[in-house]
UniProtKB/Swiss-Prot annotation:
This is UDP-glycosyltransferase 91A1. Keywords: Glycosyltransferase, Transferase. The keyword Transferase applies. GO terms for molecular function: UDP-glucosyltransferase activity. Its EC number is 2.4.1.-. UDP-alpha-D-glucose binds at residues 290, 350-352, 367-375, 389-392. It comes from Arabidopsis thaliana (Mouse-ear cress). The keyword Glycosyltransferase applies. Belongs to the UDP-glycosyltransferase family.
Length: 470
């Protein structure tokens, strides 16, 4: 391996190791931050698995290929129950993700060997590698937890001294007692049931609950870096710093930029032609990402709600999470024929940033993952939201408090929703006078998320901290 310090002539250039969790919602922001570090002349080593790196490489500009060193480490082979080529959360069923974490823990030895040989200045790591901070400390390497979660999620997590607090799903249905300001940020019961199993309690032999993973990383790191900014959630960032008694530094939201290598393919030209034919801000853009998959019942209500709303739509439909998914979902019979005059269902890949940035898009019907929220705000698109997994419920409550997006009403116990609630929510946010506040507020927040000079200053402050505290 290259020892980048050998090439550091004046001692001001850093070698930073990036070690994200095996989910694209984590690997992509880690790569985006890696690009920004490299653009300032620092060296970056990006550790992940071979297949994940191969899927990330198309996102890398050619001018950065010499300063970002991709370190391919294979997951250990064994009886880990993962499918062939299962190297990211999108590659495996939800019930097998614990085995992906066990395999990730199996990278401990090769990661240690790389750190010993390369002698970096910093390791920026994700929540899952609870075993890494003691190793970095032994080697004299500074460790930062770079959180792909926002400050509100970190502020809701259990800090030191509250080990016996919140031990059942129902305990998560109200803001925790350490939050000193008024907020509605908490889980609904149906959300608690999903996250509690893997986060607080673990039933898979050999796996470690997420609360212990993230707790070990936060306790062991020197500093917490957050993909966020003070203009969005100063109170949550301040609370996180107070709770954990160590620096909490926002790096900015890392706003996405359209792919510079993107070419006008026949696919995009077909999509663009359809969007160009529609009025400004008239289209509901529907997409639920690579992780979330609505159930058949949920998909039916979404489709029938779109139909009932009477609004034009462009739906990027994913019917299964991967080739291993043997239960694809299907649209209600006759739906596409009945809505053909005002809607398009797209079953292939689409360049999301270009689609989102199109003037015809007036609303996004989506999940409230943090990366998705950033993209929508970046292009001033208000959101109608459905929670499916992970921290999405917390993200959605923050967005609702700021009246940038609207949660489609659901039964709080079972999580079911109706076509009427979908239709009413879409019309509220997109066209009704009562929903004007959402449309105006997202424009205002775009002035923060889309202000590249402001976001660059966050990155500069982050890098200054790394250099000063190497």
């Amino acid at each position: 391996m290259t020892n980048f310090k050998d090439n550091d002539g004046d001692g001001t250039k850093l070698h930073v190791v990036m070690f994200p969790w095996l989910a694209f919602g984590h690997m992509v922001p880690y790569l985006e931050l890696s690009k920004l570090i490299a653009q300032k002349g620092h060296k970056v080593s990006f550790i992940s698995t071979p297949r994940n790196i191969d899927r990330l490489l198309p996102r890398l500009p050619e001018n950065l290929s010499s300063v970002i060193n991709f370190v391919k480490l294979s997951l250990p082979v064994g009886d880990n129950k993962l499918p062939e080529d299962g190297e990211a959360t999108t590659d495996v069923p939800f019930e097998l993700i614990p085995y992906l974490k066990i395999a990730y823990d199996g990278l401990k030895v090769p990661v240690t060997e790389f750190l010993e040989s390369s002698k970096p200045d910093w390791v920026l790591q994700d929540f899952a590698g609870f075993w890494l901070p003691p190793i970095s400390r032994r080697l004299g390497i500074k460790t930062g937890f770079f959180s792909a979660f926002n400050g509100a999620t970190l502020g809701i997590l259990k800090p030191p001294g509250f080990e016996e607090y919140r031990t059942s799903p129902a305990d998560f249905m109200k803001p925790p007692k350490w939050v000193p300001f008024e907020t509605s940020v908490a889980f609904k019961l149906f959300e608690c049931r999903f996250i509690f199993k893997g986060f607080m309690a673990e039933t898979t032999e050999g796996n470690v609950p997420d609360i212990h993973r993230v707790g070990g990383v936060i306790d062991g790191c020197d500093v917490i870096f957050v993909r966020s900014c003070y203009e969005y959630e100063a109170e949550w960032l301040g609370l996180t710093q107070e709770l954990h008694r160590k620096p909490v530094i926002p790096v900015g939201v890392l706003p996405p930029k359209p792919d510079e290598k993107f070419e006008d393919t026949d696919t995009w030209l077909s999509v663009k032609k359809w969007l160009d034919s529609r009025k400004s801000k008239s289209i509901v853009y529907v997409a639920f990402g690579s992780e979330a998959k609505p159930s058949q019942t949920e998909l039916n209500e979404i489709a029938l709600g779109l139909e009932l709303s009477g609004l034009p739509f462009f739906w990027v439909l994913k019917t299964r999470r991967g080739p291993w998914d043997t239960e694809p979902v299907e649209l209600p019979e006759g739906f596409e024929e009945r809505t053909a005059d005002r809607g398009m269902v797209w079953r292939g890949w689409v360049e999301q940033l270009r689609t989102l940035s199109h003037d015809s898009i007036g609303l996004v019907l989506t999940h409230p993952g943090w990366g998705t929220i950033i993209e929508a705000i970046r292009f001033a698109k208000p959101m109608a939201m459905l929670v499916f997994v992970y921290d999405q419920g917390l993200n959605a409550r923050v967005i609702e408090e700021k009246k940038i997006g609207y949660m489609i009403p659901r039964d709080e116990t079972e999580g079911f929703f109706t076509k009427e609630s979908v239709a009413n929510s879409l019309r509220l946010v997109m066209v009704e006078e009562e929903g004007k506040v959402y449309r105006e507020n997202v424009k205002e927040m775009k002035g923060v998320f889309g202000d590249m000079d402001r976001q660059d200053r966050y990155v500069d402050s982050f890098l200054e901290y790394l250099v000063t505290n190497r």
